[in-house]
Amino acid sequence: MTSILFEDTFEVKEIDPDGKKFDRVSRFVCYSENYEMDLQIDIATHIYPLGHERFKMVLASSLNLDGSSDNSGSYDTNKPSLADKYDYVMYGKIFKYQKENSSSKVSVFASFGGLLVLLQGDPRYLPGIELDARIYLLIKKA
């Protein structure tokens, strides 16, 4: 059993397209290499500096390597986890799942302690994503 709900490599296309709103956070506009997904993601750049680079992003329901459920939002740092393979990890909630009327795309909105994520694309590549689900977002540079 796997806890990975989505996985792809993204390339940063724009940084803060509407201007810088916060000192330590930037909004990145990205496009995926494999599934043609659009991504807007807020990242705490004082913790995880990112420029016009490629990065791998995973959405997961749990950090447990065996895929077992983890609803606590925390994990035991003394045992191996999915987080060990990534540089930047956030825990949050899907707060909006919207189907586009004019196309076969969906828009998934998530909040990670106020840092927002918008992932848009073909719903075939987002089968385990559900409204109100608690998820982990994991990133490492490609």
Curated annotation (Swiss-Prot):
GO cellular component: RNA polymerase I complex; RNA polymerase II, core complex; RNA polymerase III complex
A GO BP annotation: transcription by RNA polymerase III
InterPro entries: NA-bd_OB-fold (IPR012340), RPABC3 (IPR005570)
A GO molecular-function annotation: DNA binding
Superkingdom as given in the UniProt entry: Eukaryota
Alphabetical UniProt keywords: DNA-binding, DNA-directed RNA polymerase, Nucleus, Transcription
Predominant location category: nucleus
UniProt region (Non-specific ssDNA binding), positions on chain: 16-40
Protein location: Nucleus, Nucleolus
Quaternary structure and interacting proteins, as annotated: Component of the RNA polymerase I (Pol I), RNA polymerase II (Pol II) and RNA polymerase III (Pol III) complexes consisting of at least 13, 12 and 17 subunits, respectively. Directly interacts with POLR2A.
Function: DNA-dependent RNA polymerase catalyzes the transcription of DNA into RNA using the four ribonucleoside triphosphates as substrates. Common component of RNA polymerases I, II and III which synthesize ribosomal RNA precursors, mRNA precursors and many functional non-coding RNAs, and small RNAs, such as 5S rRNA and tRNAs, respectively.
Protein family membership: Belongs to the eukaryotic RPB8 RNA polymerase subunit family.
Designated name of the protein: DNA-directed RNA polymerases I, II, and III subunit rpabc3
Organism from which the protein derives: Dictyostelium discoideum
Classification of source organism: Eukaryota, Amoebozoa, Evosea, Eumycetozoa, Dictyostelia
Gene: polr2h
